[in-house]
């Protein structure tokens, strides 16, 4: 009886590995179709204000911020916001002013807090300096192409669209294995997974870029409606959809900086993100385990006690995973994050992060301790051992 059960388990694990390999192919195909779409033309190019909340001098910060200053767009303003007068990012902004004297830049330094979400509090302090009615809220670590604003505005002008967001790829800040592992997770799992979710009808708002009109923001309650939510992007997306408006995906794909140089630090970053996603879409998060086919293929080899067919399955899965990873990197026009030999470790690390996310709801982020609870993350003071 036990040998039969082992055989059944091995076959089930093997089928899961095949499903994961199939998802890798589907994700690559979805990306190719997305990249081949014809971008909608803008009916007009209204003035835009970019809101950039800052916190510290991050790796590649100046390069990322400079990419916003080189937009192929007629009229735009950038408002930078900080909450500490001694923030080292201020020196980066001084250099940007010298490099781009013709770009309209405003800097807001204000310690005033609004609710529990410090980023949203920063944005609330910044908003009065916004001169224009089209707003783009973008993370500080986004590296954007010169047509970034044109792409966002074109998507926002489509019928029934109230909010525009973007996919993003990963860009390692250092030539380290850890940096490449982090970029690979974004490029090979998050990005194609987000495209497949959209193909199945979901319209998630991805907080790295959020573009909307001032009128739409006011209709959903303004930034103050987000002030007590740490998953502010998801909440904003739901509020906009509640108005009968769509959350659209712009054609442009920025890159986010992957700053980590040590695996434990990367693990904690990915764990924080995993707990956030799990709190928002728990079923979809659990099913995302299929995305890591080499983990399931390796488990198949172990459970089958090294059966020949299991080794063949592992090799085939590895090949498919490697080809898809290389193809995705090529479509994104980024350097291959990982060699094919590192992919099993990447899948093992991803699965470890997923399983560890169920251990506790505690999330530590920039000095705050939070509990990941649906529908968002709410900061809370926790005694040792709680959560």
Task: Enumerate the predicted regions with their spans.
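Acidic donor-binding loop at a coil-to-helix junction in glycosyltransferase catalytic cores
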Residues: 229-235
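N-terminal membrane-anchoring/stem segments of glycan-assembly enzymes
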Residues: 1-44, 183, 196, 325
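Short beta-strand-to-loop acidic/aromatic patch adjacent to the donor-nucleotide binding site
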Residues: 123, 132-143
């Amino acid at each position: 009886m036990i040998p039969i059960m082992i055989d059944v388990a091995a076959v089930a694990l093997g089928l899961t590995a095949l499903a994961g390999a199939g998802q890798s192919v589907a994700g690559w195909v979805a990306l190719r179709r997305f990249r081949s779409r014809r971008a909608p033309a803008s009916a007009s190019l209204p003035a835009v204000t970019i809101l950039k909340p800052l916190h510290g001098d991050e790796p590649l910060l100046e390069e990322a911020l400079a990419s916003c200053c080189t937009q192929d767009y007629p009229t735009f303003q950038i408002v930078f916001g900080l909450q500490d007068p001694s923030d080292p990012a201020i020196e980066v902004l001084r250099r940007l002013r010298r490099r781009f004297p013709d770009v309209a830049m405003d800097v807001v330094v204000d310690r005033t807090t609004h609710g529990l979400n410090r980023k949203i509090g920063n944005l609330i302090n910044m908003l009065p300096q916004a001169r224009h009615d089209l707003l783009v809220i973008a993370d500080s670590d986004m590296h954007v192409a010169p047509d970034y604003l044109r792409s966002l505005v074109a998507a926002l002008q489509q019928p029934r669209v109230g909010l525009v967001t973007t996919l993003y790829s990963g860009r390692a800040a250092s030539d380290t294995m850890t940096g490449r592992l982090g970029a690979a997770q974004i490029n090979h799992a998050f990005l194609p997974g987000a495209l497949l979710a959209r193909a199945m009808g979901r319209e998630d708002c991805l907080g790295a870029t959020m573009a909307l009109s001032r009128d739409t923001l006011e209709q959903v309650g303004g930034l103050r409606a987000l002030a007590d939510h740490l998953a502010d992007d998801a909440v904003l997306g739901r509020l906009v959809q509640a108005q009968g408006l769509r959350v659209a995906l712009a054609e442009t794909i920025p890159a986010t900086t992957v700053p980590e140089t040590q695996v434990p630090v990367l693990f904690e970053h990915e764990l924080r993100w995993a707990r956030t996603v799990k709190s928002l879409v728990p079923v979809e998060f659990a099913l995302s385990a299929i995305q890591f086919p080499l983990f399931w293929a390796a488990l198949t080899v172990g459970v089958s006690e090294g059966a020949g067919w299991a080794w063949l399955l592992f090799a085939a899965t590895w090949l498919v995973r490697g080809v898809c990873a290389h193809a995705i990197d090529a479509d994104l026009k980024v350097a291959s994050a990982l060699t094919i030999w590192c992919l099993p470790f990447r899948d093992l690390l991803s699965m470890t992060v997923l399983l560890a996310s169920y251990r506790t709801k505690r999330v530590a982020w920039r000095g705050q301790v939070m509990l990941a609870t649906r529908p968002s993350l709410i900061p809370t003071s926790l005694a040792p051992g709680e959560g």
